UniProtKB/Swiss-Prot annotation:
Glycans are attached at residues 202, 236, 929, 956. Residues 112-303, 521-550, 582-607, 719-777, 1152-1171 are annotated as: Disordered. This is SUN domain-containing ossification factor. The modification Phosphoserine is found at residue 1082. Residues 207-219, 241-255, 272-287 have a biased composition (Basic and acidic residues). O-glycosylated. O-mannosylated by POMT1 and POMT2 and elongated by POMGNT1. It comes from Rattus norvegicus (Rat). One of its GO terms (biological process) is regulation of bone remodeling.
Length: 1253
């Protein structure tokens, strides 16, 4: 326990610090000392939540700790255990919620759960306190707001502004707000049913961003309650609620990119697409910024322009032709009530008027002021742009009223769309029928209103510059803010919408304001009449449009009830006039309102005050009426009850009295018809404007009762049958409806001629109804009072006598043609009831027929007229508004077929548009196209410039890249060229080398071939020489062998010197020893000698005794042969000698030299002979004669030695070879050349070297 207490204290301190640092999370309010305990208890519970957060990882310890902490917190409280339980449960959850707002979702999942059963029980216990809690706190804090808090928990956002302000509101509410707040905040986990039941409305109202219906919210709460035991499930439920709330908010979110800006950087749109986008954007801007700038500000000026009477003598109009019986035809073009065109009724009356200038016809006015005469009933109007012509375009058949006032017939743009735009200058009028049975049918006045070419140009020009002339808006408050917005939405482009708005405004102005100008010219009576005419259409519009007043709905119901009522027979003329069921029903409701305020002028003044207040509060009607919602409901109920009572009375009276009660129900029907047209199309502002004018007219009527009576009549007269066709706009519709009802009423009154007593009954019923309603005058709203004003004027007129009767009859007639004929004829009423209101145009003819059949027995005087109408087709067309409407359309179709063959051609070539308008339209179109094209081109230029800049940048980048690549390519090319040049150089070198090699190879081949040839030749020569040598050798050897063998002694002993000498002498051989013979075993030659020289060295051995016997010989100087060149090694070895002999001593020492004594001829000296003998003796060879020839050869030998010293080596080699040979046989030539053999002398032991022999 101590550990838990310490932890609890620590956690409480941390929670207090966190609350101090973040006061927006501090939900608890401490306002007094009494609330301090709950404050601390909540802090402790918050501490519990923080402790759970700190010890989140220890899941096994969370639940016991929470339980213990809750017990401890309960011990601190001084409140009853039930309250403690309640507060503990919700404060813990509250702290969890606030902690969850700063924790992530996984952290939130670890929080401990709260028992849903305990919560529900605690809620039941404290339900009373909860119900009594302040509504502000409940409205401010709701499950949805908690969901928002949880939804924003990830970003540590505490709460929404409304949620952060909750503590102050709770504190203001009182001390109980603490518990209430704690109860309300955790409602997303498990919301108590009591809270759900009580505060759903507050939730839906307080949270405009997230509106949830009660059923949806309860279903969500039930889901959350089912999952209340599990925190994860609770979180899942909250997630689902978040998703659903986001889904609720999605539909109201506006996509900022819904209107695509014309500037798309990526794609350049075409001119048409761009133009459409720009026009749409401009249209939206104009509608959002200036909703009333679509034609309102300049409407009055346009109306004044259009109020020119182009059939007036003042401007140059004249009568071109007329029936021959007509007198003073030009009088109808003069604004003088005392002048008139006179015609007997029996003749066919017609006339042709040339207008001042070509115009677009907008309205006709016709009047007959003469008392004792028949007024025109039906007349046909034809138009043409040239005269004379045999092709008149039938504009239509118009139905007048039996009234001696100006009757206006404005042309509906929808119905007369084929003709309104045509510029015509000639009008032909044919009177088809008339009211009454007087002899003369005079005509006092005819007016033609329209738009000339210049006016049309000015209108369109002004309409295009409305946005630029905002300073004029303040001048015209009569026009509503939303005036003509519907038309602008329907129009395809701004120009078309402007033109349509202008034309519609012109027509509306002609219908509404045109009467005032006419009144000014005519006088007080005409003024009052026109005023009332204008007020009637406005009255029903105002009543139908006002939001707080539910009169239109009730009026619709009323209409249906009237349809079901038993009909009473009415005069036939009245029924056809009121053929439009919708219009009649719509008119009936205003008449009912008028009946309520009929008898009192005080009601008029009060209604005036109400109208003023409504005009001033036109923009704040909802605000003005919120405070009096209960009053509004009370008044609405009272009005409905009064109308129901009146309706029931009229039904009963109609059953009692067939003709008269029939008049009563028509009064109601008139009322309905007046109210319903505005309910369909009229705007609030239109109502306000009309109410304003109505109030003004009513004031004038209050001051002039007589004028009022006339005005009532005029009101009934003005709406002619053409108006029954719904005019182009809501404003047009309501005046048409009213005028129709009034016209029909007037016709019915005239037809009813002598039924005035029957009309008194409806007046009385209306008075009674007024009395009943007077009991509850406060119950009516301002709109109802305004209508009361209008009706009071009518009541005053009714009080005047016959005029009143006429009015009542008109109401009756307009109200129920349907209810009257069903009584008489059962099938027709069934058909009319079965046919819907939308098919009113089709049902009208049938209604008219039935009315004729029913009415004929009722009114005797009207029978002949009805028969006349039925007899002629034109009259049949003119029977009534319903029948004439259908016939009128058929007639219009026929006329268009006759005139054009195709109605669409009217807008084509046959339709003549003014030169001004053609030029203006083309100029405007060109201006628009130029401006748009200029903007488009400017935008294109900007885009083009941007694109060009981007392209230039890209181009520069590409250029840089190309430059880099080119530079790199150039470098690569340079390197490649260098490599190529290097390779080329190497190739040239290679080619040169190859060429040189080829040349050298060729030369080598040549040399080789030459050498081969030389070798071959040398070989051949060698072979030849060898052969020759062999042959010579063979011959020489054979010869030498023969000679030698033959000449040599066969004994082996040497001959004696004497014998030898003798033999020499015998052979006569003369020899000369050039060299002293050296007796030695070897001899070395160092020089070279010619191979032809033969050196024979023979060792001679003589005994000393023989030496003595020898003859003396002459000693010669011994010459030593010195080699000029150094000794070279010989192949077979060196010549071996004892010692080289250098001088005589050496030479002598080596052997003894003997000089042969030659006995020469006597002529020679003894020395010579001795020498010769010695030589011969020495030689002893026959073949060596040249060596022993004598001393004559000595010099020659010396010279030869000198010459041949260069050849010593070769000779030495040969000598070596010869010396070394030891064999006794003679070497061959080959052996001698190679030096491989030693030549010896056989047995003699003398080594001989033989050269070339």
């Amino acid at each position: 326990m101590k550990k838990y207490r310490r932890a609890l204290a620590l956690v409480s301190c941390l929670s207090l610090c966190s609350l101090v640092w973040l006061p927006s999370w501090h939900v608890c309010c401490k306002e007094s000392s009494s609330a301090s305990t709950s404050y601390y208890s909540q802090d402790d519970n918050c501490a519990v939540g923080s402790e759970d957060i700190q010890f989140q990882k220890k899941n096994e310890r969370e639940e016991p700790s929470n339980a213990k902490v809750s017990e401890k917190s309960n011990s601190y409280l001084t409140i009853s255990p039930e309250e403690n339980k309640l507060k503990d449960d919700y404060t813990v959850d509250e702290c969890k919620i606030w902690k969850q707002s700063k924790l992530s979702l996984p952290v939130v999942e670890a929080l401990p759960t709260v028992d849903s059963h305990e919560e529900s029980s605690s809620v039941v216990v404290g339900s009373e306190n909860i119900e009594n809690s302040s509504s502000s706190s409940t409205s401010e804090t709701s499950p949805i707001s908690k969901l928002d808090e949880i939804e924003n928990s990830g970003t540590l956002s505490v709460a929404k502004p409304g949620d952060t302000e909750q503590p102050e509101a709770d504190c203001d509410a009182g001390e109980a707000a603490d518990a209430d707040a704690s109860v309300e905040q955790p409602a997303f986990v498990s919301a108590p049913e009591s809270l759900v039941g009580q505060h759903i409305e507050n939730v839906s109202s307080s949270h405009g961003k997230e509106k949830v219906t009660k059923s949806e919210f309860e279903s969500k709460v039930s889901v959350s309650e089912q999952d209340g035991g599990d925190p994860k499930s609770a979180l899942n439920a909250s997630d689902t609620l978040k998703n659903e709330s986001s889904d609720y908010t999605k539909p109201r979110e506006t996509d900022p990119t819904s209107v695509t800006s014309p500037k798309d950087p990526e794609d350049i749109p075409t001119f048409d697409e761009w133009k459409k986008k720009v026009m749409e954007v401009e249209k939206e801007k104009s509608q959002s910024l200036h909703p009333s700038s679509n034609g309102g500000p300049h409407a009055t000026k346009k109306v004044q322009k259009n109020r020119n009477n182009y059939a007036s003598v003042e401007c140059g109009a004249k009568i071109l032709a007329a029936n021959p019986e007509a007198k003073s035809t030009s009088a109808i073009l003069i604004e003088n009530m005392d002048l008139y065109m006179l015609n007997p009724c029996s003749t066919k009356i017609w006339f042709v008027i040339e207008l001042c200038e070509p115009i677009q016809v907008k309205q006709f006015d016709i009047a007959n002021y003469e008392l004792f005469s028949s007024t025109p009933k039906d007349f046909l109007v034809s138009i043409s742009d040239r005269y004379p012509t045999n092709k008149w375009i039938k504009l239509g058949t118009f139905h007048g009223r039996d009234e001696r006032t100006v009757q206006s017939f404005p042309l509906d743009e929808q119905m007369y769309a084929k003709y309104v735009k045509m510029f015509i200058k000639y009008i032909k009028v044919e009177l088809l029928s008339h009211f009454g049975s007087e002899h003369f049918c005079p005509l006092s006045l005819i007016r033609v209103f329209g738009t000339s070419m210049v006016e049309e140009y000015e209108e369109i020009a002004d309409s295009q510059y409305q946005s630029e002339r905002q300073e004029l808006f303040d001048e015209d408050y009569d026009y509503p803010l939303d005036y003509n917005t519907v038309e602008d939405k329907s129009s395809k482009n701004l120009l078309g919408s402007a033109t349509n708005a202008i034309l519609n405004m012109v027509n509306i102005a002609a219908n509404i304001l045109g009467a005032k100008t006419e009144d000014l010219t005519e006088g007080d009576k005409s003024i009052s009449e026109n005023a009332t005419a204008t007020t009637e259409p406005k009255m029903p519009e105002s009543t139908g449009v006002s939001t707080p007043v539910p009169s239109p709905e009730y009026i619709i119901k009323e209409v249906h009830t009237h349809d079901t009522e038993p009909p009473t027979s009415d005069p036939p003329k009245e029924s056809p006039i009121v053929q439009l069921v919708q219009e009649e029903e719509e008119e009936a409701s205003p008449s009912t309102v008028t009946l309520l305020g009929s008898g009192e002028q005080e009601d008029e003044s009060s209604s005036w005050f109400e109208s003023e207040t409504q005009i001033l509060c036109s923009e704040l009607t909802s605000i003005c009426c919120i405070s009096s919602f209960s009053e509004y409901l009370y008044k609405w109920c009272s009005v409905r009850i009064a109308l129901y009572r009146q309706h029931s009375r009229t039904v009963s009276k109609g059953k009692d009295v067939s003709p008269q009660p029939s008049l009563l129900p028509p009064v109601d029907s008139v009322e309905v018809s007046v109210l319903q047209p505005p309910s369909g199309n009229v705007d609030k502002e239109d109502m306000e404007r009309e109410l304003e004018t109505v109030a003004l007219d009513d004031l004038s009527s209050v001051h002039q009762a007589h004028v009022r009576n006339h005005t009532v009549d005029t009101v009934e007269l003005e709406p002619s049958y053409p108006q029954t066709l719904s005019q182009s706009l809501p404003l047009d519709v309501t005046p048409e409806m009213d005028s129709l009802s009034t016209v029909e009423g007037s016709e019915s009154v005239k037809s009813e001629g002598g039924h005035k007593p029957s009309q008194v009954m409806p007046q009385e019923s209306s008075v009674e109804f007024d009395d009943e309603t007077e009991k509850k005058p406060e119950s009516f709203s301002s709109v109802a009072k305004l209508s009361v004003i209008y009706e009071t004027s009518k009541v005053n007129e009714v009080m005047d006598g016959p005029v009143k009767e006429d009015i009542v009859s008109t109401h009756v007639v307009t109200k129920f043609p349907e209810t009257k004929f069903p009584e008489t004829v059962a099938p027709p009423p069934i058909n009319t009831a079965a046919v819907p209101e939308s098919e009113g145009m089709e049902t009208k003819p049938s209604l008219a027929d039935t009315l004729k059949h029913v009415v004929t027995p009722v009114t005797d005087p009207s029978l002949p007229e009805v028969k006349e109408d039925e007899q002629s087709p034109d009259d049949a067309l003119l029977r009534g508004l319903q029948r004439t409407a259908t016939d009128f359309y058929a007639e219009l179709q026929n006329s268009t077929d006759l005139g054009y063959g195709n109605g669409n051609l009217v807008h084509g070539s046959n339709q003549k548009e003014s030169v001004f308008m053609r030029l203006n339209n083309r100029i405007k179109a060109l201006e628009v196209n130029m401006s748009l094209s200029g903007r488009y081109l400017e935008e294109l230029s900007q885009r083009y410039r941007k694109q060009m800049e981007e392209m230039q940048k890209a181009f520069n980048k590409t250029i840089v890249k190309l430059q880099n690549t080119s530079r790199i390519a150039e470098e690569q090319d340079q390197r490649q060229t260098e490599a190529i040049h290097l390779l080329q150089a190497q190739l040239t070198n290679m080619t040169q080398i190859v060429s040189n090699l080829s040349a050298t190879v060729a030369e080598l081949k040549r040399e080789v071939s030459d050498r081969q040839s030389y070798l071959v030749m040398s070989l051949v020569l060698c072979v030849v020489l060898g052969l020759m040598l062999c042959m010579q050798r063979c011959r020489n050897t054979s010869q030498f062998d023969g000679d030698y063998t033959s000449k040599l002694p066969k004994s082996n002993q040497y001959p004696s010197p004497k014998r030898c000498f003798s033999s020499y002498d015998d052979m006569n051989l003369k020899r000369r020893t050039s060299f002293p013979l050296i007796r030695s075993k070897s001899l070395q030659f160092t020089g070279k000698e010619d191979p032809n020289d033969l050196y024979i060295v023979e060792p001679l051995k003589f005994s000393p005794e023989k030496k003595k016997k020898r003859c003396k010989y002459k000693t010669e100087k011994i010459e030593t042969i010195k080699p000029a060149d150094p000794l070279h090694p010989i192949a077979n070895g060196d010549i071996k000698g004892r010692k080289p002999f250098t001088n005589q001593r050496d030479f002598s020492s080596m052997g003894e030299v003997y000089h042969s004594s030659y006995k020469g001829p006597p002529s020679e000296g003894s020395s010579e002979t001795s020498s010769q003998s010695e030589e011969s003796y020495f030689c002893g060879i026959s073949a060596c004669t040249s060596l022993c020839n004598g001393q004559t050869q000595k010099t020659k030998l010396r010279r030869g030695l000198k010459r041949r010293r260069s050849k010593v080596q070769d000779q030495g080699k040969l000598i070596k070879a010869l010396i070394q040979t030891k064999s006794g046989s003679l070497p061959s030539l080959h052996d001698i050349i190679k030096g491989n053999k030693e030549i010896t002398v056989g047995a003699f032991g003398v080594t001989a070297v033989s050269g070339h022999i």
